[in-house]
Amino acid sequence: KYQKLYHYNSLLVRHKFSQKKVRIAGGGIAGLSAAMFLQSNNISTVIYEKESKIGGSRHGDYEGLENWIFNDDIHSSFKDIGFEFNKIQSSPINSFFVHTSSEKPLRIQNKTPFFYLVSRGDNSNDIDHQLFRQCKKAGVEFKFGEMAPSYCDIIATGTRKASAYIQGINFNTNLKNQVHLLLGKKFAPKGYA
């Protein structure tokens, strides 16, 4: 069913945009993904990004790409868009610790990664920059430091206001890298950490 839908969408997109260069407002992950999908279907694209470079508004913060949100594994899902996931620097997370105020930490494990940890930003090891490089190699055109024209075909400029604010901390330790999920009012009122 998924393959039929994907094939239908590819045909629909190819028919609609075959005669022009598709204009995309926003060079975040959504804009890059839209451009790569179209470009891999032989549809020319141009991305308008108001920042001077891709990932410029992020600063090396970490994000988890959940493996369970895709119909197939994350590698296949990225391939369907046109990206090569094996060229993206990431750390598969197969286990993590869950903390509550009433129990000892519980270790959760799985053979298949729960998610892949990636850094965000404009450095060479950040996912934003790595997706940008793959888009450039595929022929996506970029216009930096200018607002998108009002007649863009795809709007991928993100939200106007953050839906959550996250505070992080970096510190040196002799321990191996690890992931901890903190639940409950004591650790994270109205959310999780």
For each predicted feature, which ranges?
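Predominantly flavin-linked oxidoreductase catalytic cores and closely associated redox partners
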Residues: G27, N125-A193
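Extreme N-terminal leader/targeting segments of oxidoreductases
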Residues: K1-V22, S40-N41, A148
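Glycine-rich FAD pyrophosphate-binding loop
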Residues: A25, Q39-D61
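N-terminal FAD cofactor-binding segment of flavoenzymes
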Residues: G55-S102
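Short, well-ordered alpha-helices that flank and scaffold nucleotide-derived cofactor binding pockets
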Residues: M36, S40, R133
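Hydrophobic anchor at the start of a short beta-strand
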Residues: V22, I43-T45, D153, V179
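N-terminal Rossmann-fold NAD(P) dinucleotide-binding loop
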Residues: G31-L32
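Short beta-strand to alpha-helix junction loop
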Residues: I69-D72, N110-R133
